[in-house]
């Protein structure tokens, strides 16, 4: 196609988990999608049980099949042994290949090249590559941490990793171990594949020791709890990448959406990176679908921005807790500075004066569309709650105000929901001061916007 333009409804930049999941979701909605990107450098990564469940839920069956035998977790943190939980060890090169197979199965057009430039175009965007120019109505940026200017950033960290050889075969396993100036992670897939990774302050890696020397220090520390590492040797070349938690604009322009790490990148210590990347696909695909349908961009931008800020704050709180725990056990400069930096990012905002329960018009994710709906805003749920047990709260409240003598059964018929679900929603409204009488309050499951 060199020299002329190829057109699709959506261009997705980045063929990792977030990009592929979003591209496949858009194909299920009937849109034409071109996906740009190549597989990452081969290394081992941890895939949590809930990330695996999400791959399966999203229909990414080839990628889900990469998770084989669960790996036990071990090591030390906060002065205590780590032994709880497990994760699956996947080779990122194989995972990315499987993701591309999933994309092909859904009919996504895959271009194994990178975008050299992105330019606004009439009604959309132009993507320039080495082979030519592509046009699309919507642009999904899923290129990871390097995408866009950071609006928020955690401590400046870098991850240094390298493959290992001469690791004795055993069951899949991961280990975490704190150092005075960082922490290291080891993963073995049980079939001879193994990797060691060091996370340290960016400035700390320039303190004189070579990358290979620093990684050998990690191996020596890890060998204290894993005898199989005593004879391990570094293989190939070390690989460095940015590892700072990062927040970017989720919707920088109409028809332009950031997904996965491009919008919110997690602190590596949290172990939730792949899950968060996959979970962004629903909102990103709905944003694209809503824009292509000709609806207003303002609710889409607001929804994506508020969602990203909420995910960012959750990620920062998780990181702050981890670093504070280790700083108490190892009060060195690295741990105290990282813990302090996250605590500063987490400083409480001035609280809004808000009654216990109030109704507001807010954007919500309604299936595959983002639209404005009345939601119940509470102190615990400042973004608002739209549904409880799949019952739309505003419609329920409107019905009960119009029919004050009606019972749960009548409301259930009106809303086409089960009486049990309606009773649950009535109980939730009463508990938050949004309904003065009627119903009971069983256990409920609230749905955020």
Please identify what each model-predicted range represents.
Residues 2-18:
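Beta1/beta-strand and adjacent pyrophosphate-binding region of the FAD-binding site
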Residues 52-100:
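A conserved beta-strand/loop capping segment in the N-terminal third of enzymes
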Residues 104-230, 247, 264:
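Predominantly flavin-linked oxidoreductase catalytic cores and closely associated redox partners
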Residues 117, 155, 206-286, 290-328:
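FAD/FMN-dependent oxidoreductases across multiple families
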Residues 289-373:
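C-terminal helical "tail/cap" subdomain of flavin- and related membrane-associated enzymes
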Residues 337-400, 423, 427, 437-449:
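Acidic, low-complexity/disordered tracts enriched in E/D and polar residues
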